[in-house]
Structure formats: C-alpha cells, structure tokens
Amino acid sequence: MRYFLWFSLLFSLLNSTTQIPKDPISPNIIFILADDLGWSSLSEQMDPAMPGSKSDYHLTPNIDRLLKSGMRFTQGYAPASICSPTRRSILFGHTPMRQDDESFGSRYEPGKNSFLTIPQVLKKINPEYVTAHFGKWDLRIGIPPASFGYDFSDGDNGNGQGNTINTKDEKWTTFFTEDNPKQIDTLTNRTKRFISDQVNQNNPFFLQLSHYATHANITARAETIARFEKIPKGDKHHHAAWAAMLADLDASIGELISHLDQLGIRKNTYLFFMSDNGGVEFIAPVKNRLDHPDSFPSPMCNAPLRGGKWTLFEGGIRVPFFVSGPDIPANTSSNRYVTGYDLLATFAEIAGSKQPNSFSLDGNSFKASLSNPKTTSDSRNLYFHRFNNGYPHSAVRSG
C-alpha cells in the first residue's frame, strides 16, 4: 500500500513537470479607417489643450468612449490628403512619394517585388494570424485584397460599393436616406461574424475595417437626420445630414465595441482608429481642387486647422488618430507625431517582432509610446506631396 502511494505521488510529479503550458495567444489587432473625417469633427477634443479641437455640433459618444479608453495622438497624420495614396501607404508602410501615383500599379503588383503588406508581415511573425479587410479598398489598380495576402475580404471595393452616387451635381447639394447608409450595418455584421469565428477557433486575428462613411454622397438614416435638424447648429459644423451620417457611423462603432466586450477579448485586443485624410473645408466645397491651396476663405469645417481634403495644410492631413488596448493608459494623450505608414511597423511589434522596422519600411513603430505618452517624436521629417489631380504643392512636418 505504501509502495502504491509513493508511485502515485511520483507519477503525479512527473506528469506535472512534463506538461508544457501554451504560450499566450498573440494579440488581436483591429484597425478602423474612417473616410474624410476631419481632425475636429468628433464631439471629444483631439487635443486636450485646444478646446476648439472638437465639433460644436456633431455627436459621437461611442467613438469618444473608445478614444478615452486609450491614447489619442494629437499630431496624427494621414500619409496623403486624398484616399487612395493613403490606403496604399498604410498597406505597405511606405510613403506615397516612394510609391508614386502613376506607376504604383505596375511597381507594386504582387510577385514583381519583395514588398510586404500588413497581412504578409503578420503571418511571417505568427502564421496563425487570420487576416481580413472589409469595406473600402480603393487602391484603384484592379487588384483585390486577397492578392495582397488577406484571408477574407469583400473584394476590390471603391466608393461605389458604399452607395456613393457619382453624380457631381448632386454629390454635395443633396443628401440621401437609407436604412443601411454607407453599408454601415453590412460591414458591422460581417465584422462581428469574422471576429466571433476567430474567437471560437482560438485564432489571433488582424482586421481592417475601412468604412465608406463619411465620404460623399451624404447618406444617413432619415430618423438620424431628423434628430440633428432639431439640434442647434454650430458655427463650425451645421450640416444636419452630414452630422447624421457621422452619427450612424458612430452607432456602428458602439455596436462593435459591445460585441468585443461580450466576447471578453478587449484585454487582448488593440483597436486603432484614424481617417484617410482630413475633412473637406466646406460642405459643399467652394473651390476647385485644381485651384491654388490659398484660394479658399475662412472659417472652415476643420478649424482651428487650416485647409482640408485635397490640400497639404494641416486640415488636409492631420486627422483623428488614437489607440486603445492592453497596457495603454486610459484617457491619455501623446504629442509625438505619427502617420499612417507607421502602422505596419507598430502592428509588427505588437505581434511579437523584435525588429519591426526590418521589413523595408518607411515608417517607425510607435508601440513604446502606447505605454508611455511622454515618449517624444523621433528626429525624422514627414514629407507630403500632392502630385496628381490637384494643384502641385508639398509640405514638411519637422520637429
């Protein structure tokens, strides 16, 4: 009997020491890319030191809640002042000037170079990552997300798939009402299903959710427009239908956050949010995009910033930019300047890379800043150039 007890104890000890605990699952990363959303368009300040860095009319309680759960970057920049160059830049971690607008399609065609995309880099770090892109793709080269490494997507989509009616005369002077404006519900439901599937299979995932809102045409739910028609208008923002379109987007962000909370994965999930460029200066625009950047009057929709979409003044390239996730102190701000082509390096470091800047990238990881808002900017300059379908001009962000 004594021999049996000693044998049982020895077996238990050996068994306990030979069990190898599983490594923690790699963090999930969700990147939400809004369209044409200005730096001061939210109802929460993008810079706590600047009272004017929020809207005097728009209501975005859910986006504000996400912003305040993490760190806002007061000097976050889109790579370009229009959508397609920004989206290409984010995908590869390269500056738009390196990519070039005219030759991008031929130079970056899959198989013709060694450039890596976000999903390809993440899978090199951890092959278990499952990746998805839903919404506005809009690289404008006829190559879908799957060809650049995404496991799931809804194809080579542009503004048209977001119920944008490309009638220039109506684009800004009219608004449209729909029950599923800008495919907001469709995208949100698809996103929730994808996330649930990966959680059930214990897969780490990367998801880019590229909303069609708030790009023209202006489209919102009728009841949301009616609500804003009853709210006193501001001096800076006063377009009820555009405010409603943003509010419908905001509601979908709240639905997504609630879904993550219900799944219990917020502690292992990073959420990044930014816009592809600044907002338009006026709704409707009062100038031709080929005009000199000084041709517009004041005030404007992006105040206190100057300019807007299509220009390289601050209003055209400085955008809402914030991150929520593990070990990120809530309701904090960083004055470090960051840009969209820094995201790939940052995602790589979050996924576990010890050398996130080793993938032939132009951007730098800012992961260190996520736990320390006092981290200063690096010594580089940010360069911007508007070289196609616009008045040629450049900008440099330094210091």
Model-derived features: positions:
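Hydrophobic h-region of N-terminal signal peptides that target proteins for export
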Residues: 6-17
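Positively charged n-region of N-terminal signal peptides that target proteins for export
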Residues: 1-3
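Formylglycine-dependent sulfatase
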Residues: 19-398
